[in-house]
Amino acid sequence: MDRKVKVVQFGTGKMAVYTMRYVFEKGGEVVGAIDINPNVIGKDIGEIMGKENTGVTVTSLDDAEEMLKNVKPDICVVETMSLLEDVKDALLLCAKLGINAITTCEEAFFPWNSNPNVTKQIDDLAKQNGCTITGSGYQDIYWGQLITSVAGSTQKITKIKGSSSYNVEDYGIALAEAHGAGLTLEEFDKQVASADRISAEERQRVIESGKYLPSYMWNVNGWLCSKLGLTVKSQTQVTVPKTNSKDIYSSTLGKTVKAGDATGMSAVVTTETEEGIKIESECIGKVYAEDEFDKNEWTVYGEPDTTITVARPATVELTCGSVVNRIPDVINAEPGYITTEKMGDLTYKIKPLNEYVK
């Protein structure tokens, strides 16, 4: 491509501050931004990034389609919510207009195993209009490529076990609420945990209905199996609340989470495969106490056993860096809903983004 990659930012919250700056620093340009928050509509994106004004202002969602038709971006970066159902309209709008899209929506990383009908709806429309839709973020490397790379150096694998923790304070209110932060244990049990006390048949019915609430690792395990060529035999999910012995104030929730109430949750996903390899992954998302920090640890068991630990990863920056480095891959990919394990490894882009676009 002999011009700058044109990007529209969908959602201008905490993540967008980094993503938009990274796009400019990688030689792209943000030509539009969309939000529903009346406090940011009309604001210059430079102000949102803490930089000089750019002349590009935030458009309201009501005017999004018209703006997209006018600026004709190469790709939209959708950074709003955590469930496919909640970003569906944004992704379908992109697919309808033939605009590529990449989203940090965690379910979108591999939504075929949690909301196949909506995924197919997006897939069909994207194919019809010649664009690619995908999900990426922190998990693309740290719950995905890092593990499959270790697997590539292993003679025999019997089990893969992973655990990752993160502070829900860093990602905004949608994510915090999705983790049950601030709920009493009774509310958590009713609103979050009870959804997983069901049979495999019932779970499949909920998945087909589009109402399943997957933890992040649910989609990650599906991605790993696809990348490693494994056939899923069964997959289960259990969610348990995390608590603290002292009150913790959450700036994201705008309230104090009382001692003994849920600060978030741990979700454990277990996948059995036809090939005999088990994948067990745990995701811990909560409002951190003062002495807690992010940690990502995975072990590939077999011949030999290998453990990799990433302590205190800058998860927000790594999420946004992954998305921006993926942009050329998305533009180059075949049309449809194409998950990133089919795009090849995520690589560092040393040159301007457009130089990687075929």
Task: Label the predicted regions.
Residues 103-104, 133-136, 161-162:
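General beta-strand structural signal in soluble alpha/beta enzymes
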Residues 36, 81, 105-109, 138-139, ...:
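Short, ordered loop/turn segments at secondary-structure junctions
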Residues 127-156:
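Short alpha-helices
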Residues 286-358:
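C-terminal helical cap and adjacent loop that interface with cofactors, partners, or active-site loops
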Residues 1-96:
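N-terminal glycine-/serine-/threonine-rich beta1-alpha1-beta2 phosphate-ribose binding loop
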Residues 6, 10-14, 152-286, 291, ...:
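Active-site-lining helix/loop region of Rossmann-like oxidoreductase modules
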Residues 78, 82, 94-115:
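ADP-ribose/adenylate-binding Rossmann-like module
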Residues 106-130:
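Rossmann-fold NAD(P)-binding glycine/threonine-rich loop
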